[in-house]
C-alpha cells in the first residue's frame, strides 16, 4: 500500500500527463482532511501536498476538527514549495468551543496561512442533537439570537480578514452567522456543505446566503459512502438554482475508505458534467471562486 501511494504521489497517477488538458490544473480544494489527526486518515499532509502539486492543483485548505492547522500549513509549504497550502481553526470543544482567543492565536500563527474559521462542526449543538448523542456541545445561538461570543468571533474574522465557514449548524443558524458577518464587514464567507446533515439548507436558503455574499460549498463526500445523502442530479439542480458564480466544489476527502482528494474531485467534476454542468462552470466553482474566497484574486 505504501509503495502504491508513493508511486501515485511521484507520478500523479500518470493520467494528467496523458490528457490534453488537466482538469485539476489550478484547482484549490478548500475542504481537505489528512494526517496528522486523531481520526484515521488516508494520507498525511505532506504526501497530499506532493500528490496535489504533481496533479497540477493550485492549493489546499487543511481541515482538522480538533486541532488548528495554520502551523501545519506553514510546515507543509516549506516541505513542498510550489503549492498554496492554508489552514484554520475549527471551534469545537478541543479549542474551547466558540473561543475568540483560539481565533486570535490561529490568525497570528507564523506565515499567516491560517485563513479559515469553522464555526464548530462535530461538536456543534446541531450536530450533537442530529446524531442523538448525549454529550456536551458548542452553542452558537440561543432563543433565535447569536450568542455574544459568536458575534465576538465574527468580529475577529472581519478584523483579520479571515474566512467565515459556517461549520455544522442548523440552516437558520448558518443564515444568522452570514447576516452577522455581512453586518460586521466579513469579506469572505462560505456555507460549509450546505445540503448535508445537519445543515440541510433548502434551495431558497442557499440562494439567500449567496445573495448576502457567501459561497455555497458542494462536496464529493456527500455523494458516497456513509455520508451519501444526495445524487449528482441533486447537486446540479441546486447549483443551477443558486448560480455557479456563488458555488464552490470541494472534496471533503481523507477518510481511509474513500478516494484520494484529487480523484474525488475528478469524480465530482465528471458526475456534474453528466448532469449538464459545463466545464466553464466547474472551473468557476473549483478554481476561481476558491481563489476569491481565500483572497488570492
Give the ranges of each region predicted by the language model.
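Divalent metal-binding pocket/active-site signature
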Residues: 34-43, 116-201
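A metal-dependent hydrolase metal-coordination microenvironment
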Residues: 42-136
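Short acidic/histidine-rich active-site segments
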Residues: 244-261
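Bacterial N-terminal signal peptides
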Residues: 4-14
Amino acid at each position: 500500500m505504501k509503495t502504491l501511494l508513493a508511486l501515485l504521489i511521484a507520478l500523479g497517477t500518470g493520467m494528467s500527463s496523458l490528457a490534453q488538458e488537466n482538469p485539476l490544473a489550478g484547482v484549490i480544494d478548500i475542504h481537505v482532511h489528512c494526517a496528522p489527526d486523531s481520526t484515521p486518515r488516508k494520507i498525511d499532509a505532506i504526501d497530499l501536498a506532493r500528490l496535489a502539486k504533481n496533479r497540477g492543483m493550485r492549493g489546499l485548505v487543511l481541515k482538522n476538527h480538533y486541532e488548528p492547522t495554520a502551523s501545519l500549513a506553514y510546515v507543509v509549504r516549506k516541505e513542498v514549495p510550489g503549492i498554496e497550502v492554508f489552514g484554520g481553526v475549527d471551534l469545537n470543544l478541543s479549542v474551547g468551543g466558540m473561543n475568540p482567543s483560539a481565533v486570535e492565536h490561529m490568525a497570528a500563527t507564523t506565515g499567516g496561512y491560517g485563513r479559515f474559521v469553522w464555526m464548530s462542526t462535530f461538536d456543534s449543538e446541531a450536530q450533537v442533537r442530529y446524531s442523538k448523542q448525549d454529550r456536551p456541545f458548542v452553542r452558537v445561538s440561543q432563543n433565535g439570537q447569536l450568542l455574544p461570543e459568536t458575534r465576538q468571533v465574527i468580529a475577529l474574522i472581519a478584523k483579520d480578514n479571515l474566512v467565515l465557514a459556517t461549520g455544522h449548524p442548523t440552516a437558520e443558524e448558518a443564515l444568522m452567522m452570514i447576516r452577522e458577518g455581512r453586518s460586521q464587514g466579513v469579506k469572505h464567507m462560505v456555507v460549509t456543505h450546505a445540503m448535508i446533515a445537519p445543515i440541510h439548507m433548502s434551495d431558497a436558503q442557499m440562494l439567500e446566503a449567496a445573495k448576502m455574499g457567501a459561497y455555497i460549498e458542494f462536496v464529493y463526500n456527500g455523494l458516497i459512502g456513509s455520508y451519501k445523502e444526495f445524487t449528482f442530479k441533486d447537486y446540479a439542480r441546486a447549483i443551477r438554482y443558486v448560480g455557479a458564480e456563488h458555488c464552490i466544489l470541494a472534496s471533503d476527502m481523507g477518510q481511509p475508505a474513500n478516494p484520494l482528494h484529487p480523484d474525488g474531485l475528478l469524480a465530482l467534476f465528471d458526475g456534474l458534467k453528466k448532469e449538464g454542468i459545463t466545464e466553464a462552470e466547474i472551473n468557476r466553482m473549483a478554481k476561481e471562486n476558491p481563489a476569491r474566497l481565500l483572497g488570492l484574486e
